[in-house]
Regions:
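A conserved helix-loop-strand patch within extracytoplasmic ligand-binding domains
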Residues: 97-170
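Periplasmic-binding protein-like
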Residues: 115-119, 181-186, 193-194, 226-259, ...
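Ligand-binding "clamshell"
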Residues: 96-111, 221-235
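N-terminal signal peptide c-region/cleavage motif recognized by signal peptidases
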Residues: 20-22
């Protein structure tokens, strides 16, 4: 009897101890990003999940959503609960600020105005470059087909438009001449896809176009995936620096109690491991060590920024991409 009673007491104590053990949290994060970053974050996410597990002991599940950058921003405004956004142009985060989703000081929260990496705009042409495309001026030739995503919905397309505009300004130092130049270029665009990956599909799978204008990382990815025997990459004489801004979606993380994880996720992008993954995916990292390590894969290219050459994103948005702006005028003339 005494033995049975002792056994029951021991079992009860064991149950109490079991109940008292801490339960590790299982949390999900959603990263809403632009079209051609999906391969990057497919590698970043498991690496960060392992890092977080080591640091906190908690299991973290990371999900990702991709599309044209501006369309993705619209989805977040429409109710898609992103814990973080990783875009390719700052207007797509600023519009979240205007809608009360992101704090106005988002640029100050992380280094380099919250841009952990950059890329630039290049040309992808058919193998052997049969149309002898070397620079932006070649894209205005009659009969040439240029594939580019829609600048209204895609940051990739917007950078293409602005890179061409900047090139024309350098040549003529005249706004009217720049408008005429970009009008001729877009007259050669047979279809405007909603995002960068859609434009890639049009060029590589549907066989439409003589040249795809896209981000450097996308061009290199395609060249590698297809064995290097279908396309060549051409670097124009002048291009644009495309900095990739990131931000915590404050309204969502406060609602979901995921701020700590979301902030750590974005900080991880600046870590040595994060910068190495970024460089391996042919984005240009901010880390000097990573840039040096992968120097051979990043040819020197002359670039300008929206801020230095075009007056900043606010001016660009109002002048070029607002309803009735220069881009709309150009498209209407097509």
């Amino acid at each position: 009897m005494h033995t049975r009673r002792t056994t029951l007491i021991s079992a009860a104590l064991l149950a109490l101890v079991t109940v008292a053990l801490p339960v590790r949290a299982q949390t999900t994060l959603l990263n809403v990003s632009y079209d051609v970053s999906r391969e990057l974050y497919k590698d970043i996410n498991p690496a960060f999940a392992a890092h977080w597990k080591t640091q906190s002991g908690d299991t973290l599940t990371l999900n990702q959503s991709h599309g044209g950058s501006s369309k993705q921003a619209g989805a977040v405004i429409g109710g898609l609960e992103a814990d973080v956004v990783t875009m390719n142009q700052s207007p797509d985060i600023d519009i979240l600020v205007k809608n009360g989703l992101v704090s106005a000081d988002w640029r100050k929260r992380l280094p380099n105005d919250a841009t952990p990496y950059t890329t630039t705009t290049v040309f992808l042409v058919r193998k052997g470059n049969p149309k002898a495309i070397k620079d932006w001026s070649d894209l205005t030739r009659a009969g040439l087909q240029v594939i580019v995503p829609n600048p209204k919905t895609s940051g990739n397309g917007r950078y293409t438009y602005l890179a061409a505009w900047g090139y024309a300004l350098n040549k003529a130092n005249d706004e009217a001449a720049a408008k005429d130049f970009v009008s001729k270029l877009f007259a050669n665009v047979p279809v405007l896809d909603g995002g960068g990956r859609g434009a890639t599909t049009t060029f590589t799978q549907r066989g439409i176009g003589d040249v795809l204008v896209t981000f450097e990382n996308e061009a290199v990815l395609l060249d590698k995936e297809l064995g290097g025997d279908q396309f060549d990459i051409v670097y124009p004489s002048l291009s644009i620096e495309a900095a990739a801004p990131v931000a915590v979606v404050d309204k969502v993380v406060d609602k979901r109690a995921t701020r700590r994880q979301a902030e750590a996720y974005l900080q991880y992008l600046y870590s040595a491991e994060g910068q190495d993954i970024i460089a391996r995916h042919h984005f240009r990292p901010r880390s000097e060590a990573a840039l040096k390590k992968y120097a051979k894969q990043f040819p020197p290219v002359s670039t300008f920024t929206v801020e230095a050459k075009l007056g900043g994103w606010d001016a660009v948005q109002k002048t070029h991409f607002a309803d009735g702006g220069i881009y709309d005028q150009i498209v209407t003339r097509r």
